Amino acid sequence: MTIPTISELKKDRIIPHVFPNDKIDLNVDLFISFKAGKEVNHGNVLDIAGTGSVPRNIKFSEEPPDGYCFVLFMVDPDYPSRLRPDGKEYIHWVVSGIKTKELIKGTQKNCVTILPYVGPSIKKGTGLHRISFIISLIKEEDKDNITGLPHYKGEKYITRVKFNNYESVHNIAQINNMKIVGYNWCQIEG
């Protein structure tokens, strides 16, 4: 596991598409693996098969400090395509209240699943999509009260395309006094 460098983030245009500038201080390494050992690793290309269910294992290089917890976001900044990302960041999954260095099958004691997992569903011909995993720190008392996220009322009623007009994890982090501390991504083509 290694933390992505600013030059890596610029090369794959994570900066400016996910983070607006290089004023990002990533210090928590993030390891993600799906079924059959498919690992997310700094923009590697994965086949969409096997990403339909929650990642089997997510590891962090460290635990959050006392009084804080991690919030894990999984988003697609290339929705509906990288050339025309009109939907801004499509939200695939949000889990809050993570207090340990490992999340097995998407949960652990005291975690709050704010938005249940929805795997990538990418239309053919839209090119590679950068599926992004973002870790932020939030005060533990605020773990289930994050402003700007859509409210989950069952799959039939949810619109995941928008962060209630806040457009991105970066903006959600700012309005909720969260600090983004970790990032990893893969690319998936429909």
UniProtKB/Swiss-Prot annotation:
Keyword field: Lipid-binding
The keyword Glycoprotein belongs to this UniProt entry's keyword annotation: no
GO molecular function: lipid binding
PROSITE patterns from the UniProt entry: PBP (PS01220)
One Pfam family per UniProt: PBP
PANTHER family: PHOSPHATIDYLETHANOLAMINE-BINDING PROTEIN, PHOSPHATIDYLETHANOLAMINE-BINDING PROTEIN 4
Family of this protein: Belongs to the phosphatidylethanolamine-binding protein family.
Listed name of the protein: Putative phosphatidylethanolamine-binding protein
Species, as recorded: Plasmodium falciparum
